[in-house]
Amino acid sequence: MFRDGAPDHPTDPAQPGESVQQAGERADRVLAYVSKVHQETHKDVVAVTHGHFSRVLIARFLKLPVSVGASFQMSTTGAAVLSYDHSCWEEPTLLGMFAPSLRPTAFLPSALDPKHEEYQYLDLVDEVIRCGEYRADRTGTGTRAIFAPQLSLEFDLTRGTLPLLTTKRVFELLWFISGKTDAKLLADRGVHIWDGNGSRDFLAQRGLGHRREGDLGPVYGFQWRHFGAQYVDADTDYTGQGVDQLANVIHAIKTNPTDRRILLTAWNPVDLSIMALPPCHILCQFFVSMREGQRPCLECQMYQRSCDLGLGVPFNIASYALLTHLIAAVTGCEASKFSLVLGDAHVYMDHIEPLKEQLKRAPRDFPKVHLKREVSNIDDIRPEDIDIQGYQPHGKIEMRMSV
């Protein structure tokens, strides 16, 4: 596929006829064209390249720098499918196929595979955009969606690793832990995740117009700390009311770590109608691995029924990973792994183009997290106690939240 031409060296056919930058840009144009054909036809594309450009194209397909292409070993016995006046038949020829379902990360040589766990998320986003069915939704925006992706997303939490995309999720998690339901407490911290769902208009649409603005009802934190209590409003003191699931989780990890009932749920059918928004991430289970001679390791698996891949899922990953770290800190464990099982995995239609931009970005190393002081009670942890190091996010990509 030489739709952009094949520049030759003016005197030596064994040498490239363009700069490294020019070759890389040309490879990117070819790959963009392949992507366009896939989107329009959903059919395979056969690509034929020749000489030095073969290595360049492979490198760029794998999302690696052009310079890495020089390390690829290629046979010189490929079929001569191109001919021009001064062709050098000792140059390798590449005849390959790009399929619509082909993802470059699956073909990285083991020595070059970055194995960055964020690719699990990026590959899922790409699959939903390409293969998801169109579905109307309650917000009126519309989505592309698939149900129950085959593999869960798994993240290594050892050595303090935190799969984090925004530090603002720290405040939301501590808000959950506190059992509070007032979105204004987050807004005062500059966190506006819940503003839309706590607005007067939205509450009125839900039949909750009698509540003051910001009163979200018995959402996540309330269920974690007061499951079964009768909800009045966001200003009521619920101390001692209902089941404190989070306290029970921590107690079980300390006293009965092999228990198979160490669960935390936010899904309470009795309260769904009085919540501003029913919970999207509804259940998590903890597992304590106690291998002989090793410190106990804490794992968490969460099930999410409604998975907004653009805005929700990356932040939910960070939030539950951090929750695992905090529970590990107060139970004498080491955080080990977080797994996410997805139900309705969807991309809102107005997020497709922004997410395509995100797919072009190479993931960066996840930051590390630790507590600045020793804490035995999870309720004593404050935002200033949480130290996140090595956080180097890409620039923000704007995506509107559908309410």
Predicted features by range, described:
Residues 108-403:
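Terminal, non-catalytic protein-protein interaction segments that mediate quaternary/complex assembly
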Residues 53-55, 348:
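Short, active-site-adjacent cap segments at secondary-structure transitions
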Residues 19, 23-34, 124, 169, ...:
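Alpha-helical packing segments of well-folded alpha/beta enzyme cores
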Residues 36, 40-43, 59-112:
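Acidic, low-complexity terminal tails and accessory targeting/binding regions
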Residues 40-52, 262:
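Generic beta-sheet signal
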Residues 1-29, 83, 98:
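Phosphate-handling substructures
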Residues 24, 28-36, 58, 324-328:
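Generic structural signal for well-ordered alpha-helical scaffold segments
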Residues 57-58, 355:
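Hydrophobic packing residues within well-ordered alpha-helices of enzyme cores
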